[in-house]
């Protein structure tokens, strides 16, 4: 799949789910805030409880760019964690390496953040980690590899060009953009994680 095809797919998915998954999708979604297709402008019929919860699960999956298997694993892990299952799910997903690369402003989209990790541009505590699903622990530092910092995408990131299209840096990250370095200072709290989701609906979907 080419970058253009991937971009179009993300825009279409954004409109179907009712959330902007990329900066380009945000621009288009503002102009056409309805589902794609011939009947996109018509009012959506009353949905079943199942359909509502299914869409909420799909929204969460899309925002983290993960597979069904990965999301279900986060749910299963959450059921064995103290506290509310949904909050535990969000905290777990938010500590993914690719998610934090995006939150720090090193990348513009989730897909780009994942690509940077897979292509071995990202260090965790000085060591290359090429698994997007790697869970970063409080106190650990992520940084763009010194050799990679000369690349145009990272030079742009260091200048803060992505900050206008990304949510504000969350309180659990201490970011030094010029150095392309960020530290996870503590566990993320569910209410401060910048994703659009009714997490209880997701829990109810899997618990049914």
Swiss-Prot record:
InterPro entries: Ribosomal_uS4, Ribosomal_uS4_bac-type, Ribosomal_uS4_CS, Ribosomal_uS4_N, S4_RNA-bd, S4_RNA-bd_sf. SUPFAM superfamilies: Alpha-L RNA-binding motif. One of its GO terms (cellular component) is small ribosomal subunit. Transmembrane segments: none annotated. Keywords: Ribonucleoprotein, Ribosomal protein, RNA-binding, rRNA-binding. Residues 95-155 form the S4 RNA-binding domain. The keyword Nuclease does not apply. The keyword RNA-binding applies. One of its GO terms (biological process) is translation. GO terms for molecular function: rRNA binding; structural constituent of ribosome. Part of the 30S ribosomal subunit. Contacts protein S5. The interaction surface between S4 and S5 is involved in control of translational fidelity. NCBIfam families: PRK05327.1, rpsD_bact. One of the primary rRNA binding proteins, it binds directly to 16S rRNA where it nucleates assembly of the body of the 30S subunit. With S5 and S12 plays an important role in translational accuracy. Belongs to the universal ribosomal protein uS4 family. This is Small ribosomal subunit protein uS4.
